[in-house]
């Protein structure tokens, strides 16, 4: 008989092992009309709790400066959203009844386990990390979501890192089911003292591409002028709109093809260029937008941001988009170029499959198009527990303790890195 499918549950304990948080997943999908709810369970040692309360907080923050620059009480960090939940003692009117997974965990863990629940607002940004430079230390810049559980008499009471649990989650988007129209653009260049023109037309074979999938750029040139096109450059550029105190746009080339294809006067030219944007070719570019990163996992170029119509862009943190630029280098006539916007995302997984990891860290990689190529092999994810989906009984649940701190020999002060 085959094995029953397992339910993956993430587990993390405080350094003093008095508090443990359980989550069914760490990636929460933004469906544009709603966001997956954050539901989990916190287990607390009653002898440690005493007369205190158990609080869980969800924070969305935008770090826009290096952590080592935080001096004199100034922090290069802005909290975009903070929500608090009192897990114990339970409030008289809980926001919703426990989910099926919470019920199973509560039965397994006993009376000292308590559920918590958060709703992520739709207008919050997705998790994005800005790639640090080779010499940068500390937490990377970008947008992240963090769950923190602690025991205290009140929310205002300061808790020690040793007595709390911090766990980073991600808000993600997947490719839409119905892609947009095929991107195309054209332009005509007229030169001084001449009535003849140079016409450039470019198009992509589709609008939506998956990470690792090559782009086919169709370039058609009609040169009725007296100028000569010396070479053709095709590049993919990432645009990151940083919306914080003011809006600024940063662009970074992530792939480029340059060919010495010449187009003589009074002639035409047509060619398909293939180009693939990959993070593996851009490891040294500081400030490049990446999908939100969890420690011990690799990631990929940031997915395109899909904004719901009417959303307030001022609170969106980082908006990511991509364009293909086709440029003709003309002798003694300047450059002629067009841009083609496209969407770069992960495919939407099936409901019964766990949310996909980045290409180089996918425990269960999503089904990609035949042309989509993962970058590297997948390591084993040890930060999870699995139990069988037996709805009749929960006696067969087996927890696999996540003991990375003890295995690595880390000290309590190292716990400040919440990505572990």
Curated annotation (Swiss-Prot):
GO terms for molecular function: angiotensin receptor binding; inositol hexakisphosphate binding; phosphatidylinositol binding; phosphatidylinositol-3,4,5-trisphosphate binding. Keywords: Cell membrane, Coated pit, Cytoplasm, Cytoplasmic vesicle, Hydroxylation, Membrane, Nucleus, Phosphoprotein, Protein transport, Signal transduction inhibitor, Transport, Ubl conjugation. The modification Phosphotyrosine is found at residue 48. The modification Phosphothreonine is found at residue 393. GO terms for cellular component: clathrin-coated pit; cytoplasm; endocytic vesicle; nucleus; plasma membrane. GO terms for biological process: desensitization of G protein-coupled receptor signaling pathway; G protein-coupled receptor internalization; positive regulation of ERK1 and ERK2 cascade; positive regulation of receptor internalization; protein transport; receptor internalization; signal transduction. Changing residue 251 to Q: Abolishes phosphoinositide binding and ADRB2 internalization. Changing residue 233 to Q: Abolishes phosphoinositide binding and ADRB2 internalization. Functions in regulating agonist-mediated G-protein coupled receptor (GPCR) signaling by mediating both receptor desensitization and resensitization processes. During homologous desensitization, beta-arrestins bind to the GPRK-phosphorylated receptor and sterically preclude its coupling to the cognate G-protein; the binding appears to require additional receptor determinants exposed only in the active receptor conformation. This is Beta-arrestin-2.
């Amino acid at each position: 008989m085959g094995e029953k499918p397992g339910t993956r549950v993430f587990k993390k304990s405080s350094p003093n092992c008095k508090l443990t948080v359980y989550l069914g997943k760490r990636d929460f999908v933004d469906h544009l009309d709603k966001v997956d709810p954050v539901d989990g369970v916190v287990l607390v040692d009653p002898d440690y709790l005493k007369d205190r309360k158990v609080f869980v907080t969800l924070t969305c923050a935008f770090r826009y400066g290096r952590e080592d620059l935080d001096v004199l009480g100034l922090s290069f960090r802005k909290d975009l959203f903070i929500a608090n939940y009192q897990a114990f003692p339970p409030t008289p009117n809980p926001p919703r009844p426990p989910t099926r997974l919470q019920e199973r965990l509560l039965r397994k863990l006993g009376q000292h386990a308590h559920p918590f629940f958060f709703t992520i607002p739709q207008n919050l940004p997705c998790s994005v990390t800005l790639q640090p430079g080779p010499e940068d230390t500390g937490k990377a810049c970008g947008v992240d979501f963090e769950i923190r559980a602690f025991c205290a008499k009140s929310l205002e009471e300061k808790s020690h890192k040793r007595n709390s649990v911090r766990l980073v989650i991600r808000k993600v988007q997947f490719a839409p089911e119905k892609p947009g129209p095929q991107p195309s653009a054209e332009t005509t260049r007229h030169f001084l003292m001449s009535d003849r023109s140079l016409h450039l037309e470019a198009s992509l074979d589709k609008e939506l591409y998956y990470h690792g999938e090559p782009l086919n750029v169709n370039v058609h040139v009609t040169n009725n002028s007296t100028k000569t096109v010396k070479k053709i450059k095709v590049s993919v550029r990432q645009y990151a709109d940083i919306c914080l105190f003011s809006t600024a746009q940063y662009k970074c080339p992530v792939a480029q093809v340059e060919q010495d294809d010449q187009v003589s006067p009074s002639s035409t030219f047509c060619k398909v260029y293939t180009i693939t944007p990959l993070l593996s070719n851009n490891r040294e570019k500081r400030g490049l937008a990446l999908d939100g990163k969890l420690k011990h996992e690799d990631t990929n170029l940031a997915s395109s941001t899909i904004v719901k119509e009417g959303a307030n862009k001022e609170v969106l943190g980082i908006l990511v988009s991509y364009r293909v630029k086709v440029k003709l280098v003309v002798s003694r006539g300047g450059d002629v170029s067009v841009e083609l916007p496209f969407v770069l995302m992960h495919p939407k997984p099936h409901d019964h499959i766990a949310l996909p990891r980045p290409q180089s860290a996918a425990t269960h990689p999503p089904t990609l198009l035949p042309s989509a190529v993962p970058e590297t092999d997948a390591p084993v994810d040890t930060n999870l527990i699995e139990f069988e989906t037996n709805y009749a009984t929960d006696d067969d649940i087996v927890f696999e303790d996540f003991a990375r701190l003890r295995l690595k020999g880390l000290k309590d002060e190292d716990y400040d890195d919440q990505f572990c």
